[in-house]
């Protein structure tokens, strides 16, 4: 982790090996009718539990300007139990939060986003996993080129609660997938939690069957629950003619309302990175995701290891068999060793953002 100015960055090389995880949930105190008591041992509401002091998520991000790369965020209760109650892996409560090549895993309520309409989240090339409302909350969230992985029959992906947001939850060029249980044709794209939520899926590759209606009821009438250019595994357009357009709330004061299920190509063209993420103040998290080229002409000489300079690099970190042996701003290292192994270069550059670059023996 590093603090760059007012920005917090958490990065590593491999999200499959770098895992922030904990076993907890927010289940209430059991009563005489509670059949399964296993959850209570890991509940934050249990004063005798080791997680009683936690807020209810494995990781809570309370401040703006947060960036994470190659990290997995896992709630072990959700993943292991494959059951409720609510078990967050992540809760993000601020503006300008971005993730690249990360994993988020649980079962119910995997990731709760901010409740403020003006806040922005950007997610690229990530893995979101769960079964019940596993991406929920508010704010403008653009999720691109990511996998939404469902783990049970009747999974529901999103449950937004926007008040008067402009874009809401936007999924562009994403993949919807799941295990065998989730592939039974009962999967839903989402349901409206509170207020006037919005969720749009654009250019989605759907690998497992969706329920024909696509969406389901919850606590309010959505402002917009829609798709554009949803495709099956063969690239064939999905039939959206049976998608849900009429909604009904539950509770004592039931309400009915309508919401269209598709948007036009002209409308879809407005759901861009520039409009959703950059337009307000020029925030550009993609710049932190850019790859520098690998160091070239790596060679051993009498006075150490040398390589050609990489334009834009501020420095170089040498990692040998998992151990950092040198950090330098030069294009050579005085490190010498007869130890055989993999030399891993990690570049430090102007964002600044470390990158795994080149291995040499």
Residue ranges, per PLM feature:
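Single conserved hydrophobic/aromatic residue that forms the stacking wall/gate
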Residues: 1-5, 349-360
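Sequence-level preference for short, compositionally simple segments enriched
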Residues: 6-351
């Amino acid at each position: 982790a590093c603090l760059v100015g007012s920005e917090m960055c958490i990065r590593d090389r491999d999200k499959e090996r770098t895992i922030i995880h904990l076993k907890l949930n927010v289940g209430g105190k059991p009563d005489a009718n509670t059949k399964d008591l296993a959850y209570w041992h890991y509940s934050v509401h249990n004063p005798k539990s080791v997680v009683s002091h936690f807020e209810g998520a494995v990781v809570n991000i309370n401040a703006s300007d947060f960036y994470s790369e190659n990290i997995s965020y896992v709630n072990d209760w959700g993943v292991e139990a494959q059951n409720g109650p609510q078990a967050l892996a992540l809760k993000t409560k601020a503006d300008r939060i971005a993730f690249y090549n990360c994993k988020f895993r649980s079962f119910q309520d995997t990731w709760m986003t901010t409740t403020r309409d003006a806040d922005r989240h950007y997610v690229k090339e990530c893995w979101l996993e769960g079964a019940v409302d596993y991406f929920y909350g508010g704010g403008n969230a653009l999720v691109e080129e990511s996998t939404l992985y469902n783990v049970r029959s009747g999974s529901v992906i999103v449950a937004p609660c926007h008040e008067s947001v402009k874009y809401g939850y936007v999924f562009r060029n994403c993949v919807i997938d799941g295990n065998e249980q989730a592939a039974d044709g009962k999967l839903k794209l989402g349901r409206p939690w509170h207020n006037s939520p919005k969720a749009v899926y654009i250019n989605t590759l759907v690998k497992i069957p969706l329920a024909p209606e696509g969406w389901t009821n919850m606590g309010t009438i959505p402002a917009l629950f829609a798709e554009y250019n949803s495709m099956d595994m063969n690239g064939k357009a999905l039939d959206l003619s049976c998608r849900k357009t009429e909604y009904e709330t539950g509770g004592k004061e039931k309400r009915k309302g309508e919401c269209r299920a598709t948007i036009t190509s002209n409308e879809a063209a407005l759901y861009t990175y520039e409009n959703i993420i950059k337009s307000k103040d020029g925030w550009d998290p993609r710049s932190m995701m850019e790859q520098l080229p690998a160091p070239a002409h790596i060679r051993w000489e009498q006075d150490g290891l040398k390589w050609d300079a990489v334009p834009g690099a501020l420095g170089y970190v040498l990692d040998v068999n998992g151990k950092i042996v040198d950090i330098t701003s030069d294009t050579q290292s005085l490190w010498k060793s007869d130890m055989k192994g993999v030399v891993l270069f990690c570049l430090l550059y102007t964002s600044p953002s470390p990158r795994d670059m080149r291995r040499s023996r």
